[in-house]
């Protein structure tokens, strides 16, 4: 305001300046494509006509114009925002850049294999240091995998337990089948507890090894009682066994929720006092009433819970073990959203590269990083260090490294 306006309002020298009031409006700056043009000196002899050229700057991929920023944009588009490559092709064309989906697919395969795989392998080795991990799997179609059309392949996911909020690791692995050989190989150097659903292959691994414990998922058990309750007439639901069991599981979860901010030792102690008696009572009820069960849905729910009892009780023996595998299901959700959009992967190499890139993307998100900026940083730094015999530089690229540029981290909510 002008001095005249202030004098009119307050009188001569009748005011003092306070801190400014601030208003904000947000502007959006659209993406744009720029060309980095490098000029290389070319020289010819005046006597015999032979030519020499200066050194070209090293490219990210030999014979390709792709840069770290462009590759990061493709990765962010497909593997974070679930945009199929044909739509990215159309989007880039609107910005004046003509690149085919086949070119982009080839870039993803080569970048995954040549650069990002080294960080993936490093994260894999670090996952072994966690006392509790989680595992899950989801089907995926691969068009050219040497089998008949419609044959299911699988994307397996392994992640650090969600009781460890810092230094999260989420790793995908593509395999053609769902048999036990795949987690057996992936977890061959792991000792600890793995939280899973009730899929038998995990129990097979536990029987083979003394250093691996499988913990069960209470959400999968609860889901079967939900399904059993759904077939009971509404007016009789509150009198049904399904309802009583679900109320007991709800009580267990409510008490568990109150322990989330405790240390592992305190959580275990409180579980023994407040939750174990409820679990004991629940399984006693299931065993007592198993022979009285009527509907097929309820029989299935009773059978599942009783068969899984050993695994469902593991969380009562270790404060780091969660009650369910929800964290691994959340970790695989990004892949499932993308799968609905692009429906199938073209080749086995594409599936393997997708597993690597999804792993980096989901691990970045879990550690509060901005995936695009993280991809660009990795694709700038890793190529420069690939000839290093010492791989310690990978520690500086981990999502929790303090040496990462600050711009890669998501800002705290205002």
Where are these regions (language model features)?
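Helix N-cap / beta->alpha transition motif
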Residues: 1-2, 217
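Carboxylate/His-rich catalytic cores and anion/metal-binding grooves
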Residues: 2-63, 67, 99
């Amino acid at each position: 305001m002008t001095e005249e306006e202030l004098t009119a309002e307050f009188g001569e020298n009748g005011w003092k300046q306070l801190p400014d009031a601030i208003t904000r409006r947000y502007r959006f700056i659209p993406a744009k494509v720029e060309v980095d043009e490098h000029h290389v000196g070319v020289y010819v002899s005046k006597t015999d006509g032979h030519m020499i050229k200066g050194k070209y700057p090293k490219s990210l991929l030999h014979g390709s114009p792709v840069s770290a920023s462009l590759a990061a944009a493709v990765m962010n588009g497909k593997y974070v925002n679930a945009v199929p490559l044909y739509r990215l092709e159309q989007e880039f064309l609107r910005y004046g850049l003509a690149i085919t989906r086949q070119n982009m697919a080839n870039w993803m395969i080569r970048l995954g294999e040549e650069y990002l795989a080294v960080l993936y392998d490093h994260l894999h080795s670090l996952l072994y240091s966690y006392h509790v991990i989680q595992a899950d799997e989801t089907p995926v179609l691969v068009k050219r995998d040497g089998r008949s059309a419609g044959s299911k392949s699988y994307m397996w996911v392994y992640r650090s337990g969600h009781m460890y909020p810092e230094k999260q690791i989420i790793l995908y692995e593509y395999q053609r089948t769902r048999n036990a050989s795949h987690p057996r190989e992936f977890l061959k150097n792991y000792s600890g507890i793995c939280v899973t659903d009730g899929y038998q292959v995990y129990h097979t691994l536990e029987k083979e090894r003394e250093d691996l414990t499988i913990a069960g998922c209470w959400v999968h058990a609860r889901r079967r009682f939900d399904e059993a309750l759904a077939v009971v007439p509404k007016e009789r639901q509150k009198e049904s066994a399904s309802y009583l069991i679900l109320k007991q599981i709800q009580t267990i979860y409510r008490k568990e929720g109150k322990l989330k901010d405790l240390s592992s030792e305190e959580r275990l102690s409180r579980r023994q006092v407040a939750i174990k008696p409820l679990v004991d009572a629940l399984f006693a009820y299931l065993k007592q009433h198993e022979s009285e069960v009527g509907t097929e849905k309820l029989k299935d729910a009773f059978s599942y819970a009783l068969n899984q009892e050993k695994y469902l009780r593991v969380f009562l023996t270790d404060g780091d073990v969660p009650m369910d595998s929800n964290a691994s299901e959340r970790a695989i959700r990004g892949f499932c959203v993308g799968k609905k959009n692009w429906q199938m992967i073209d080749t086995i190499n594409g599936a393997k590269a997708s597993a690597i890139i999804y792993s980096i993307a989901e691990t970045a998100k879990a550690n509060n990083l901005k995936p695009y900026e993280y991809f660009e940083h990795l694709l700038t730094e890793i190529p420069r260090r690939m000839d290093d015999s010492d791989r310690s530089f990978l520690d500086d690229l981990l999502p929790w490294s303090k040496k990462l540029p600050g711009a890669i981290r998501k800002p705290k909510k205002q």
